[in-house]
Design a protein with these regions (language model features):
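Catalytic core of bacterial c-di-GMP phosphodiesterases, primarily the EAL and HD-GYP domains
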Residues: 5-78
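A short alpha-helix capping/helix-coil boundary motif
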Residues: 28-29, 60-63, 85, 111-112, ...
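Glycine-centered small-residue hotspots that permit tight backbone geometry or close packing
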Residues: 4, 8, 87, 99-100
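EAL-family c-di-GMP phosphodiesterase catalytic domain
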Residues: 37-39, 66-73, 91-204
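Helix C-cap/helix->beta junction micro-motif
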Residues: 56-59, 89, 138-139
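Alpha-helical scaffolding segments of alpha/beta enzyme cores, especially the outer helices
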Residues: 17, 47-51, 78-88, 106, ...
């Protein structure tokens, strides 16, 4: 394993620790752990990932592997075997940074990932490729559209058939005042501890 491999494994382990923390706190919160496609072509790297997954003893469905930098046929073909090994361990597969190329769509047909993540702003200038229209109806997968800041972005997300939409148009920023009024909020309590005030705003 190279130094980069070891660094990625350390970050992956930290991600597993975070998921485990929430799971033991009684919250079933899945986590998507990003991983460059080229690293998934290494058998020794997949062996190391498998050891980490088997040792964490998390239930199936909590660990999601986010594959990114999947840009050419070589990276797509070389990572398939490793991803199949991950799937046999109960890991769900997500494709990050989807751009709608024919090669990526063929890869989706082959792998059938559980999630596809699309940065919708990339289609503002030239519009959606024909292959992207009604994408949600073509595959049994969840589609996540991000960076929705314009009405055009939302229209494109609807044309794709996205199941989840994120961005400034969908989620305006939450002010500190609103956060302080959120009941049972760790963030609110952290802010309150830094800036004490006579009014507890519901946080006790």
């Amino acid at each position: 394993l190279t130094a980069t491999d070891k660094q990625l494994l350390r970050l992956f382990m930290e991600g597993l620790d975070t998921i485990t923390y929430w799971y033991r706190s009684g919250r079933f919160i899945p986590g998507i752990l990003p991983m460059p496609a080229q690293h998934l072509a290494s058998n020794s790297f997949i062996d190391a990932l498998s050891d980490l997954l088997l040792n964490c003893r998390l239930p199936v469905g909590l660990v999601n592997l986010g594959v990114h930098k999947l840009q050419d046929a070589d990276s797509m073909d070389s990572c398939v075997e490793g991803l199949l090994r991950m799937r046999r361990l109960g890991v769900l597969i997500h494709l990050l940074d989807f751009s709608g190329t024919s090669a990526q769509i063929n890869w989706i047909k082959q792998m059938e990932p559980e999630g596809i993540h699309i940065e919708i702003g990339q289609f503002r200038a030239e519009g959606l490729p024909n292959e992207m229209i009604s994408l949600g109806q073509k595959f049994h997968t969840e589609i996540y559209a991000s960076n929705i800041t314009l009405v055009k972005d939302l229209e494109n997300a609807m044309s794709i058939g996205a199941h989840h939409c994120y961005g400034e148009l969908m989620m305006p920023p939450i002010s500190r005042h609103q956060i302080l009024h959120t009941s049972d909020s760790r963030i609110a309590k952290a802010i309150f501890s830094l800036h004490p005030h006579k009014n507890l705003n519901g946080d006790k």
